[in-house]
Amino acid sequence: MKQEFSVKGMSCNHCVARIEEAVGRISGVKKVKVQLKKEKAVVKFDEANVQATEICQAINELGYQAEVI
């Protein structure tokens, strides 16, 4: 599945790298691309292994505000 997430609170490329690294480590995530200027993340993942809510939670735990769009 491919899902877009709104991500608020990012200010630089380091923020992008932190999110991509953290989400990329989640079992079932195949690809993650974070876009700083658009304040969003696009994640491809296997729904059998992970849910969109878990991805949001991982981003939120880093101190950003994520939600499914």
From Swiss-Prot:
Induction: By Cu(+) and Cu(2+). Pfam families: HMA. Residues 1-67 form the HMA domain. InterPro entries: Heavy-metal-associated_CS, HMA_Cu_ion-bd, HMA_dom, HMA_dom_sf. GO terms for molecular function: copper ion binding. Keywords: Chaperone, Copper, Cytoplasm, Metal-binding. Cu cation binds at C12, C15. CDD domains: HMA. It is found in: Cytoplasm. GO terms for cellular component: cytoplasm. It comes from the Bacteria. Acts as a copper chaperone by delivering 2 Cu(+) ions to CopY Zn(2+)-bound form. This transfer results in displacement of zinc and dissociation of CopY from the promoter, allowing transcription of the copYZAB operon. Monomer in the absence of copper. Homodimer or homooligomer in the presence of copper ions. Interacts with the copper ATPase CopA. Interacts with CopY via a charge-based interaction. Controlled by copper-induced proteolysis. This is Copper chaperone CopZ.
